[in-house]
Curated annotation (Swiss-Prot):
Record localization: Membrane
Family: Belongs to the syntaxin family.
Coiled coil regions, renumbered to chain: 39-100
Organism in which the protein naturally occurs: Saccharomyces cerevisiae (strain ATCC 204508 / S288c) (Baker's yeast)
Functional summary from the UniProt entry: Required for vesicle fusion with the plasma membrane.
Lineage: Eukaryota, Fungi, Dikarya, Ascomycota, Saccharomycotina
Residue stretches spanning the membrane: 270-291
Record-level GO BP terms: ascospore-type prospore assembly; exocytosis; Golgi to plasma membrane transport; Golgi vesicle fusion to target membrane; intracellular protein transport; vesicle docking; vesicle fusion; vesicle fusion to plasma membrane
Name of this protein: Protein SSO2
Topological domains, Cytoplasmic: 1-269
């Protein structure tokens, strides 16, 4: 399998660093919206710095893998394994941080297309690095298995493929190697091969765990887009509901205004009718009385 290093391309973060430098050197005194965007870009710059650091760490992991596959002394091998474990631990810590930071950036850019583009750019870079890390681990897993198989066939040259595979997958190896250990002339070789195969087996278990975590992380980062869209849909629904409430409120208000106008008109009509009745009473009752009195 190919050992090609997926990190030999140019640094993909230079463009963002240049953009951030321009923003940091821009004159002050902008509006609150501009200040907010600069603060957001500072956050993006921090994410890109951690992405670059993450890339460097998995480069080191790739280099450690290659060194472990070469002929090294037992002391060198132990040192390489300690160093490899440290790099893997650093990568794991950064993965959690990057996931949280990118999710936070996406949340901040929920209603700003420029911010959304920057956050999405970081997410895509992270996805690529995760995929590259998975390829590195997958290559090392296959090469480690092949090396362990070669070590086993040194002491069991007539072993079938099934027997070799069983030896690689047996964590203890005692039963698999018992026949070889019975051969006094090859006892030392068998013990050395047993130790190597056991070490490779433990390494393969760690690799499988790391690869499972990377697969889960990759899926989580892909689902961030779905989650982000769901948040947008919820907000849009809330805005739509609020708009409907406003429209309904305006409708109720208009109805109340119309009712009030109608009530005022009815009141005026009643007053006019009362005035007419009063006038009729005056004409019919009061006026004749006054005329009669004068006579």
């Amino acid at each position: 399998m190919s050992n090609a290093n997926p990190y030999e391309n140019n640094n993909p973060y230079a463009e963002n660093y240049e953009m951030q430098e321009d923003l940091n050197n821009a004159p002050t005194g902008h509006s609150d919206g501009s200040d907010d965007f600069v603060a957001f870009m500072n956050k993006i710059n921090s994410i890109n710095a951690n992405l670059s650091r993450y890339e460097n760490i998995i480069n080191q992991i790739d280099a450690q893998h290659k060194d472990l596959l070469t002929q090294v002394s037992e002391e060198q091998e132990m040192e390489l394994r300690r160093s490899l474990d440290d790099y893997i631990s650093q990568a794991t810590d950064l993965q959690y941080q990057l996931k949280a930071d990118i999710k936070d950036a996406q949340r901040d850019g929920l209603h700003d297309s420029n911010k959304q583009a920057q956050a999405e750019n970081c997410r895509q870079k992270f996805l690529k690095l995760i995929q590259d890390y998975r390829i590195i681990d997958s290559n090392y897993k296959e090469e480690s298995k092949e090396q362990a198989k070669r070590q086993y066939t040194i002491i069991q040259p007539e072993a079938t493929d099934e027997e070799v595979e069983a030896a690689i997958n047996d964590v203890n190896g005692q039963q698999i190697f018992s026949q070889a250990l019975l051969n006094a002339n090859r006892r030392g070789e068998a013990k050395t091969a047993l130790a190597e195969v056991q070490a490779r087996h433990q390494e393969l278990l760690k690799l499988e765990k790391t690869m499972a975590e990377l697969t889960q992380l990759f899926n989580d980062m892909e689902e961030l887009v779905i989650e982000q869209q769901e948040n947008v849909d919820v907000i849009d629904k809330n805005v739509e509901d609020a708009q409907q409430d406003v429209e309904q409120g305006v409708g109720h208000t208009n109805k109340a205004v119309k009712s009030a106008r109608k009530a005022r008109k009815n009141k005026i009509r009643c007053l006019i009718i009362c005035f007419i009745i009063f006038a009729i009473v005056v004409v019919v009752v009061v006026v004749p009385s006054v005329v009669e009195t004068r006579k």
